[in-house]
Amino acid sequence: GRGGFVRRVAMIKEERKRNPDLLYFDSGDFSQGSAYYTMFKGDVEIGLMNLMGLDAVTIGNHEFDFGLENMARLFRMANFPIVCANYDFTGTVCEDVVKPYVVLHRNGLKIGVFGLSPKMKGLVADKNCEGVKYLDPIATARKTAEVLKKKEKCDVVICVSHMGWADGKEYDANVIQGSRYIDLVLGGHTHTYMKHLEYVKDLDGHDVPVDQNGKHAIYVGRIVMNLK
């Protein structure tokens, strides 16, 4: 990005000083974009992300670029959770390193965070995702958000998504329209820069905010949630 990782790390540290309850997420495709990734296959990116103190990330299609073995290796290096509810990694090397969701705690509140990722066909070489099952993101979001709200008793439910923002099936808007209990969607994949939050109504008619911050780590989004 324009500011570079060093400035980003410094900025996040300053933000955490001002607000110790800050949550920081990444919506995927963090493994690609520079010659460093081509040379070191993600070690540099994961090392720098570890310095930023991420609370959770989801999986983008470019995380598969060097195959499942490399993806699992990188995820084990990460000191933050990898969440994706609609990829079934059962029987693969990633089975034990990817969770459908995590529950975070801040200032007495429980925040449930789950991830959604796009259909691999057409985006990922078959040999790089062999054995991974793609689950319907809308049905998965509906089920996972309900688990977080009802079973885990979360005060807030956040979806960190790499589905994308555009007209068409299985994008963020469709996920929201087919689910309930999601309070915020943090998007990626389509490189959309939103100057302001977009809102989509869920199954119960509630307006759910969506944010996406462009591409290449040029921008960092900042959202303040007021819980009533």
Report the location of each language-model feature.
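Acidic, metal/ion-coordinating pockets
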Residues: 1-228
